Regions:
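A generic structural signal for short, non-catalytic loop/turn and secondary-structure boundary residues
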Residues: 11, 28-30, 87
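Residues that cap or initiate secondary-structure elements
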Residues: 41-43, 72, 88, 174
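Short glycine/proline- and aromatic-enriched beta-strand/turn motifs that initiate or cap beta-hairpins
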Residues: 18-68
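N-terminal secretory signal peptides that target proteins for export/translocation
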Residues: 1-2
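Mid-chain, structured segments of secreted extracytoplasmic proteins
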Residues: 62-98
């Protein structure tokens, strides 16, 4: 009974304080939502951003997915596309995806293709996820480079309706260079709603 009252409060604070990327190879599943939210509190982190990532299962293996990213440099961008989970086992899930990214304040369009997204299950509670994303110009002729992310995920709560994970990892961008080396540290809280 107390969990029913705490879940909405937990989800509210998760949305407020989550930060980081959350690409993985497991489909949301038909009729389910995967949501990850980032918040760069008061633009504290110079290279940080606030964004929301979503995935919705059209079928057991096909998702519509996307994100909206707010940057304090006033060049927000957004992405929409489809992902397809082509492999599933007890230990690993693999997906591919295609999508389009646009910027609000410039005419640049990028195609994210091909993409390889993966989930490795180390146990019932712990896994590794991430992605390799080839970012191309809009006519697909020129690759701008391959963005990478990898994270450790820990399941912190699950019931019939919700699943909540904490994720800690890194992101290797191609259009900017992190001040701390090649990888930018990330964290997020992912929520699955069935």
């Amino acid at each position: 009974m107390i969990f029913k009252k705490l879940i909405p409060l937990f989800i509210f604070f998760t949305i407020l304080f989550a930060s980081g990327g959350y690409d993985h190879g497991t489909s949301a599943g038909k009729g389910s939502w995967d949501i990850s939210v980032t918040w760069n509190p008061f633009n504290y982190f110079e290279q940080g951003q606030s964004y929301a990532i979503f995935g919705y299962g059209l079928t057991e293996r096909l998702d519509i997915h996307g994100y909206y990213s707010y940057t304090h440099r006033w060049n927000d961008n957004y992405y929409g596309g489809f992902s397809y989970q082509f492999y599933e086992s007890n230990k690993i899930d693999l997906s591919t995806a295609i999508g389009i990214r646009k910027y609000r304040n410039e005419p640049t369009t990028h195609i994210f293709f091909p993409q390889l997204l993966y989930t490795l299950r180390l146990s019932d509670r712990i896994g590794i996820g991430g992605s390799l994303v080839d970012i191309r110009n809009q006519d697909l002729q020129i690759s701008k480079g391959v963005a990478k992310d990898v994270f450790l995920t820990v399941k912190i709560f699950e019931n019939k309706k919700y699943k909540v994970n904490f994720n800690l990892g890194g992101f290797q961008p191609i259009f900017w260079e992190p001040k701390t080396g090649q990888w930018y540290p990330t964290y997020s809280v992912g929520i699955k709603v069935r």
